Amino acid sequence: MDRVCVIGAGPAGLSVARALKRLAIPYDQFERHTDVGGIWDLDNPGTPMYESAHFISSRKLSGFFDHPMPGTLPDYPDNRQVLGYTRGFADAYGLRAAIRFGTAVRDTETAGTGWTVTLRDGSRHDYRAVICATGVTWQPRMPTHPGTFHGEIRHSSTYRTATEFHGRRVLVVGLGNSGADIACDAAASAAAAFVSVRRGYHVIPKHIFGIPTDEFGARGPQVPIRLERPAFTALLRLLQGDLTRLGLPEPDHRLFESHPLLNSRLIHHLQHGDVAVRPDVARLEGDRVRFTDGSTDQVDLILYATGYDWAIPYAQRHFEWQDGRPELYLTAFSRRHRNLFGLGYLEINSSAYTVFDQISNLVAHYLRDQEHRPARAAAFDRLIATDHPRLNGGLTFVGSARHRTYVDARTYRRYLRQVCARIGWPTLTPGMFETVRASS
């Protein structure tokens, strides 16, 4: 049982595979689909991806460590470009060789100090560690409303292209980043478009003074949140004005206290009357929807952009769950079972790719030191058991399940570096993966 099992070959799974390969840790990787890429592959059954989807973090600040996105890509690459980049990453580091495609994991169970993994074909394999990296957007959350609806009801995970809206009166329920994108598609293609929201949001444009917003924030001085927030709030007000005049409710939280809604098209469509804002749905009445303010609209299609229930079906019982989120040290290490990991089970206010690389670095060194420097691994075991860092960066996030595991990227990265220094592990440095490049 000297091998490690990696489940999933999306961005998180590829990140940890590269880290394991660099330290010569033997591993097997299982992917139920026919290729790498995870949710970014429109052909991957169950993916929530749609044709108009783009990165909400910019090209320069996204991408894997030491493998930047090509400068020929736009500021915000689309889903096909992200998929191509991700597959290029797998090829650059020769990661496909260890992946068994078309192979789903059915179950995992403890076996002494290790794990037994059962595949869909019934075969069983023993490993010393299991790394779950299958993502969080595979089980759509569908709300229910009283009444009867004569039209079509779907979750946004089934949506692919704006042609689905032609000639229809569309209601999008929910205004996260996907909901906003889809509402904009409906605004341009549907006979009528509405978006139902329960709360107000701070809408952040994708560019500020022509610079991608995350780059704009990174270029300036890194000031405390008590100074940054009022300055950025004032800037947004200057650029956009009062969004309540467009029908959006006043936010019930301060800027940065919820996942950023990054969208430059939504304000345009609201300003031009292409999409109308409605409050929460109260009930369904045949071909009409009644809202909590008593108003009604005739609707043909209700599309719920209401998020996903997190699940790890093949290992669900091994994790401790609270408010629908797994309890993990540094968002990755199980406190209950040694050598059970969850990679990618976090919400963060930045691009996740480099964050995956940073946490993968810890996972790989921890696994290596269990065999080569057991005292160092034991020191990290004590941290897993006793360390409970606050990773919110001084922010008070809104009280929703989504924000329970939310971390501030700047704080998170800094703490990961501190842990590495404390244990004696190296942090990510340019050139450290050159030895495992396929061309090397």
Label each PLM-derived region with a short phrase.
Residues L61-S62:
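Active-site segment of extracytoplasmic enzymes that catalyze sulfate/phosphate-ester chemistry
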Residues A379-F380, H388, G393-F397:
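Short, structured protein-protein interaction patches enriched in aromatics and acidic/basic residues
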Residues G210:
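Short, surface-exposed amphipathic charged segments that create phosphate/polyanion-binding patches used
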Residues D2-F55, P68-S178, C184-Y201, K206-H207, ...:
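Flavin (primarily FAD) cofactor-binding/catalytic cores of flavoenzymes
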Residues G217-A218:
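Conformationally flexible catalytic loops at phosphate/diphosphate-handling active centers
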Residues H372-T386:
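Extended, charge-rich low-complexity interaction segments
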Residues R154-S157, T386-L391:
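Non-catalytic, mobile gating and regulatory segments of ester bond hydrolases
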